[in-house]
Amino acid sequence: MGDFCRRVDCKAMKFFALRSSIRTQIMASTTLLILALIGAIVTVWAKSESTLYHQEKLNDAKILSKVLSSTYANEVSEENWSQIRLNIDLLLRENEDFLYALVSDSNQKNQIAASSPDEFQNNYIPDIVSLSVTNAAINSSEKTHVVETFILRDIYFADKLRAKRGEKVMEVSSDIQTLSGRKLGKLRIGISLRKVNLAVTNAVNQALVVGFAGLNIGWICAYFLAQHLSDPVRRLQISVAKIAGGDLQHRADIHSRADEIGALATSVNEMSAALQISFNKLKKTLDSFERFVPNKFISVIAPQGIENIEVGAASTRRMTILFCDIRGYTSMSEAMEPIEIFRFLNDYLACMGKAIDEAGGFIDKYIGDAIMALFDDGNTDCALHAAILMQQALDKFNDERSMQTGKTGLPRISVGIGIHRGTVVMGTVGFTSRIDSTVIGDAVNVASRIEGLTKQYGCNILITESVVRNLSCPESFSLRLIDKSVKVKGKDEAISIYEVKA
């Protein structure tokens, strides 16, 4: 169960590691949202400001163009070009937004009769704007024609650079007419859009400042929101990791929230409680199973866990085998009722089993009243300790049995114990729906035969030469050679046997 929990814990931590945190997602989403809002606000603001300033500039230009056209009507009709030149020259000096002013004479095929700067005078087509702009201005049927274009070369006025090539300009053209409506000429004024562009740029900068402030405020709000949402999730993650690690008594402490996270924490706690109940049941089942198949046996035939046990799984080991049998059990059982035999055996086996457990061995199987126990190869001394403890426990069992029944005349129970060391095969037999564990090998048969010799030689505990040779502290036991050459059934070679004094 520990390996299973570690695998679950590892998978859970990998899962959480692959996911970006909620705090990061909220911060990133908020940032993108704020940036999108800032972009939209700046775009709308810039367009609005640009439209507003352009409209103001356009209205002012139209009014000025109409006023000047009306003013210049008399001068044009009287061909007072010098006065017109003075007026438009003064206009450019007073207002730097005006880049050029052109007055053409319809009687002279739209030749420019007055201009400022004066370099365009007497030209038909000025080279400061494209030909299409000039044609549109001259041929327009509108009283006031407005177009935005780019100047084609640098413009100087009063020996100073007034505009650079490529600068955007708004050209307003109006007809110069008599009161009767006869067309006398055309007034064209080029107005710089620098201030309009500067105003739009300032508006965009202001919007960016406001947006940046909003972004900072949004980040702060998003941080606290992310903190509010992610901290419970992080604590819940830690709780889940602890539960996955096997701490089924752990509970997520997020009861103060009444939202989905609180509901999730409640579900996790309910899951943990259910898992704890299930694992407790499983542990009881495994503990009960170990009473049928010892854990040491399972570790040999199913090292990867009992869930992976298969029919035919086997392992060869050198072990010390102990057999114990009640002498005269058949005649004794004939004088007892079946239920009395059942109770007697349980009491007796419990007494013997406790001694074996204390000595570090484990019981492989019960064969009627006989007990077969196993000890690891390095614990041969423990097998002898177990035999001695079993004899001592049996004496106590006999005394208690006599006291409980109140019949002091009951015969005392005696047992024979045989111990041998050798190679055995531990494994499973059966088929898929019914599996049993077993230990087989010549060493098992020899141990059983040695136990049978205890009655013949009148000894309680007999061991073989292989056991004596593998003792770590033989001086700790009282050993006596009984027979150095005895043949047991099923063995061709004679073996030596020793008595162990309890």
UniProtKB/Swiss-Prot annotation:
One of its GO terms (cellular component) is plasma membrane-derived thylakoid membrane. The keyword Glycoprotein does not apply. The keyword ATP-binding applies. Pfam families: Guanylate_cyc, HAMP. One of its GO terms (molecular function) is ATP binding. Residues 1-25, 227-502 are cytoplasmic. It is a multi-pass membrane protein. May function as a membrane-localized receptor protein. The N-terminal half could sense signals such as pH or a change in membrane potential and regulates the catalytic activity of the C-terminal half. This is Adenylate cyclase. It comes from Anabaena cylindrica.
